[in-house]
Amino acid sequence: MLKLTDITWLYHHLPMRFSLTVERGEQVAILGPSGAGKSTLLNLIAGFLTPASGSLTIDGVDHTTTPPSRRPVSMLFQENNLFSHLTVAQNIGLGLNPGLKLNAAQQEKMHAIARQMGIDNLMARLPGELSGGQRQRVALARCLVREQPILLLDEPFSALDPALRQEMLTLVSTSCQQQKMTLLMVSHSVEDAARIATRSVVVADGRIAWQGKTEEVLSGKGSASAIWGIQG
């Protein structure tokens, strides 16, 4: 279970403050206007930002000040951060060992994830030889191979065409269910959120302004839709 209690980030001396509980295996969408604090929330969970106050626990363990490399969290961005001089296999392998010294079990795990992502025939290629969708599959494979209990997505598929974006969202949702991972996904699209998340959190002005069923946001009725700017 992920629990944030009054986690506070000072943005130009204006506090963003979040309290949130997410159960293990839950898939949650984080919605809200641009600049509301959605990415800040994910970066606080991942450890890329250090809170001024508050606490963050994962499965009852305090990770408020744990550095990103030691948190039980993986994060995927719109910019996939693949290393252009490394092959697909090497980029995925970094998720298992930064020195790329993989034992037989790790090699098998890497290839199993590649097969799951549908990129097992691309392992010898460089990122520059891949399409945008293929590069995001590689980046996702690198996240999943780490087998961390929490996966954070900061709009990684927003640049893809609608059909490919839906395919990637389905792949993420299925993978998280298989590995019993908790998923938090930032999105500007309520429709994308509804595809994989039954629960949504709406962020506004650096606060969690609403949380509940995604279908309520999609319906265009109620307070969540008003914050989000949807009218039914």
Curated annotation (Swiss-Prot):
Gene Ontology MF terms: ABC-type thiamine transporter activity; ATP binding; ATP hydrolysis activity
Entry keyword Glycosyltransferase: no
Keyword Methyltransferase carried by entry: no
Top enzyme class: translocase
Catalytic activity from the UniProt record: thiamine(out) + ATP + H2O = thiamine(in) + ADP + phosphate + H(+)
Major location (coarse): membrane
Keywords: ATP-binding, Cell inner membrane, Cell membrane, Membrane, Nucleotide-binding, Translocase, Transport
Residues that hold ATP according to the record: 32-39
Domain ABC transporter: 2-230
UniProt GO cellular component terms: plasma membrane
Membrane topology: Peripheral membrane protein
One Pfam family matching this protein: ABC_tran
EC number per UniProt: 7.6.2.15
Subunit structure: The complex is composed of two ATP-binding proteins (ThiQ), two transmembrane proteins (ThiP) and a solute-binding protein (ThiB).
Primary role: Part of the ABC transporter complex ThiBPQ involved in thiamine import. Responsible for energy coupling to the transport system.
Protein family per UniProt: Belongs to the ABC transporter superfamily. Thiamine importer (TC 3.A.1.19.1) family.
Protein name as catalogued: Thiamine import ATP-binding protein ThiQ
Organism: Shigella flexneri
